[in-house]
From Swiss-Prot:
Signal peptide: none annotated. SUPFAM superfamilies: tRNA-guanine transglycosylase. The gene is tgt. This is Queuine tRNA-ribosyltransferase. It comes from the Bacteria. Homodimer. Within each dimer, one monomer is responsible for RNA recognition and catalysis, while the other monomer binds to the replacement base PreQ1. Residues 247-253, 271-275 are annotated as: RNA binding. Pathway: tRNA modification; tRNA-queuosine biosynthesis. It comes from Granulibacter bethesdensis (strain ATCC BAA-1260 / CGDNIH1).
Length: 377
């Protein structure tokens, strides 16, 4: 069995879990949301600001970092933590999802993938071994196995072939991974929306990865199918290992997944929305470009303690986006990340206190009601 990175379960409420992930770069309370720092930066945020939201772990991307600035350069400069000024844990995506999405620019074979850079057209190759090697050079706290993200929709035969390839690659990743105290390697469960393939994938991975991701979801299958796949897959995974749902998602997606037993999440949604004037709030989603906010002196979310909400009005954010000022995306990105972290803290507290079902009802009712005062007024 591989050594080190561990999860301490503290409470369970139904299938939901509150735990602490222990790593070489610090402890992370779960459930946790990981802001996405694809190119060694969380877009529109200083890393001190990311820390101020309550984030305990961030995500980097192997594909983007290997192309620019390069893994060797990052390693020579002290590793990704020093390079991007983030002392806490970093999880790196293996690069598989990005490479597979290149379609016409890549060629897949049983040993790996040859692809052209989207930046300059240069040719590169990723294999399970080279992906692990790059992630080691980056000094990732959590390394992800290199896999093929199954397309959606896929026939059962296509999904089976893709899953089997990913399982062979996972075994090679496990062999290539160099264990260190407080570092870990996560396997990725594949199989699309087919329960029998998900079962086969879990069996093939075995129980000696440090954690397990559920991949191949949030790719167009819809929430009902995603939750059904989680309902089948999560109980098959080792109880004492962290469970990571990749690329998810909306607050309601996260709530439903936490209630099913997921511990870790990442998604570009809060940062991307922040750059396009969409605010996630305790009252649902607001578009700050909407004319209804032009004279609205209230904070975006009265329950939020971020700078956008404690220092500025909805009218000011509306003005910034209408004027094309860069401060608008900066403030709203901070707000969205702050809201996501607040959501995770609330879910953790509810699990610890055995009131998650009640908390979920309250959250969903508030999201559905929206900004009632303005609507009624």
């Amino acid at each position: 069995m591989l050594m080190s990175l561990t999860l301490s379960l503290q409470a369970e409420d139904g299938r939901a879990r509150a735990a602490t992930l222990h790593t070489a770069h610090g402890d992370v309370p779960t459930p946790t949301f990981m802001p996405v720092g694809t190119a060694a930066t969380v877009k529109a945020m200083m890393m001190d600001s990311v820390r101020a939201t309550g984030a305990g772990i961030v995500l980097g991307n192997t594909y983007h970092l290997m192309l620019r600035p390069g893994a060797d350069r990052v390693a020579a400069l002290g590793g990704l933590h020093r390079f991007m000024d983030w002392p806490g844990p970093i999880l790196t995506d293996s690069g598989g999802f990005q490479v597979m999405s290149l379609s016409s620019l890549r060629k897949l074979d049983k040993d790996g993938v040859t692809f052209q850079s989207h930046i300059d057209g240069s040719r590169h190759r990723l294999t399970p071994e080279s992906s692990i090697g790059i992630q080691h050079k980056l000094d990732a706290t959590i390394t992800m196995a290199f896999d093929e993200c199954t397309k959606f929709p896929a026939t059962h035969e296509e999904a089976a072939s893709s899953m089997e390839l990913s399982m062979r690659w996972a075994a090679r990743c496990r062999d290539a991974f160099v264990p260190r105290d407080g570092y870990g390697l996560f396997g990725i469960v594949q199989g699309s929306v087919y329960n029998d393939l998900r079962t086969q994938s879990v069996t093939a991975l075995g129980d000696d990865f440090h954690g397990y991701a559920v991949g191949g979801l949030a790719v167009g299958e819809g929430q009902e199918a995603m939750f059904a796949t989680l309902d089948h897959t999560l109980p098959l995974l080792p109880r004492g290992k962290p469970r990571y749902l990749m690329g998810v998602g909306t607050p309601d997606d996260i709530l439903g997944a936490v209630m099913r037993g997921v511990d870790m999440f990442d998604c570009v949604m809060p940062t991307r929305a922040g750059r396009t004037a969409r605010a996630y709030t305790s009252q649902g989603v607001m578009n700050m470009r909407n004319a209804r906010y032009a004279d609205d002196g209230r904070p975006i979310d009265p329950a939020c303690d971020c700078p956008a909400c404690t220092r500025h009005s909805r009218a000011y954010l509306h003005h910034l986006f209408r004027a094309g000022e860069m401060l608008g995306p900066m403030l709203l990105t901070w707000h969205n990340l702050n809201y996501y972290q607040s959501l995770m803290r609330g879910l953790r507290s509810a699990i610890m206190e055995g009131r998650l079902e009640q908390h979920a009802v309250t959250l969903r009712a508030a999201w559905a009601a929206g900004d009632r005062e303005k609507q009624d007024g």
